[in-house]
């Protein structure tokens, strides 16, 4: 049942061609659907959500597929790119390939430790990148957000408030 739902979502994405956006944006926050099976971890196709904490209910993309996303960015744009330990190095490359200069890393401390192979993970990262000369409102924001995790992949409310204050 779960795999059928995932296949339906994949087909809907392909049919509706969600990459054909005709606007350009000055602020973009993106949380790519990383394919953890690439890094020896979890995959939306391989795991049953009732038996594995890491299962996801959405289709994932490879690093190569994510890198090919046509980002609808204006000439002057701020990018917030969410990533995890497994894809941190790839994320720097993707940010650059999308035309953004790396500026900082925001760390989300989820308060309680999660899963991990070599070390129990408790944080997630958000790379801040600039394209051109975007307008930023002051520099009083901190590079760490401490807020408990919520539903899978849902980012902390403090992040959205920070983006609103900055941009």
Residue ranges of model-derived segments:
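Class I S-adenosyl-L-methionine-dependent methyltransferase catalytic core
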Residues: 1-167
